[in-house]
Amino acid sequence: MELKIARAIIKHGLEDLYEYSEVDVAVVGAGPAGLTAARYLAERGHRVVVYERRFSFGGGIGPGGNMIPKIVVQEEAVPVLKDFRVRYRPVGDGLYTVDPAELIAKLAAGAIDAGAKIILGVHVDDVIFRGDPPRVAGLLWVWTPIQMSGSHVDPLYTQARAVLDATGHDAEVISIASRKVPELGVEVRGEKSAWAEVSEKLVVEHTGRVAPGLYAAGMAVCAVHGLPRMGPIFGGMLLSGRRAAEIIHKDLVEYAVRA
């Protein structure tokens, strides 16, 4: 029995890694923006992989507001909640409360059911770039425990037509690209202090491509563009993920036509 268990895990697990070593879109970060984008991209027929450094998904949703088990979503994001069949409760002034555990579960299930592949415990170490002027063409990654141990282990590659940084406050992928491929012309300015009403709108408006092949969604957008933070209101994250999917889909279609 033990041998069968081991061989089943090795065979099918390595088959998944092989299959998703080349994708249309590599999303880094399985938080609200990343999972939302993954679902809408997969629904449009794109091969999507989501890498999450933790062994769980949801990003900042789980702790709710200061560990109180509720988050807030505004009216504009209700259509996204409906797409994922997430229940919500009105509180007035166009605001609604949502259960964090339900939102995490349904965002992840929605992305998976649409065809996206989520791989947990992955630390993205670097990007692949091509051309002059350069464009981002994929990722280098190792398992998170390897990165945490400080061991020098060469990473593996994932080739992607588009890379979406949905890593949150630190914009980890874009930070790496800006430092190691300065020719991309990307700068991470860092987010500002809180102004929720303004930031919820700006994060959606500024979502999109930051360099050829490289995109930002969610709090990574705030980090790149120096926008205010917003706290435990998540409508902007959901809308940013949806907008990122729309922009990436459009770019991939246009790129395929040009190619």
From Swiss-Prot:
Pfam families to which the protein is assigned, alphabetical: Thi4
Pathway: Cofactor biosynthesis; thiamine diphosphate biosynthesis
Binding site residues for NAD(+): 33, 52-53, 60, 124, 152-154, 219
Amino-acid positions noted as binding glycine in the UniProt annotation, renumbered to this chain: 229
EC class: transferase
Keyword tags: Iron, Metal-binding, NAD, Thiamine biosynthesis, Transferase
UniProt KW Electron transport keyword: no
Transmembrane intervals: none
InterPro entries: FAD/NAD-bd_sf, Thi4_fam, Thi4_prok
One GO process term, biological-process aspect: thiazole biosynthetic process
UniProt-annotated binding residues for Fe cation: 154, 169
Protein's UniProt keywords contain Metal-binding: yes
GO MF term list: iron ion binding; pentosyltransferase activity
Substrates-to-products reaction catalysed: hydrogen sulfide + glycine + NAD(+) = ADP-5-ethyl-4-methylthiazole-2-carboxylate + nicotinamide + 3 H2O + H(+)
Cofactor(s) demanded: Fe(2+)
EC number: 2.4.2.59
Subunit structure: Homooctamer; tetramer of dimers.
Database matches in HAMAP family: Thi4 (MF_00304)
Protein purpose: Involved in the biosynthesis of the thiazole moiety of thiamine. Catalyzes the conversion of NAD and glycine to adenosine diphosphate 5-(2-hydroxyethyl)-4-methylthiazole-2-carboxylate (ADT), an adenylated thiazole intermediate, using free sulfide as a source of sulfur.
Family to which the UniProt record says this protein belongs: Belongs to the THI4 family.
Name assigned to this protein: Thiamine thiazole synthase
Organism this protein belongs to: Pyrobaculum neutrophilum (strain DSM 2338 / JCM 9278 / NBRC 100436 / V24Sta) (Thermoproteus neutrophilus)
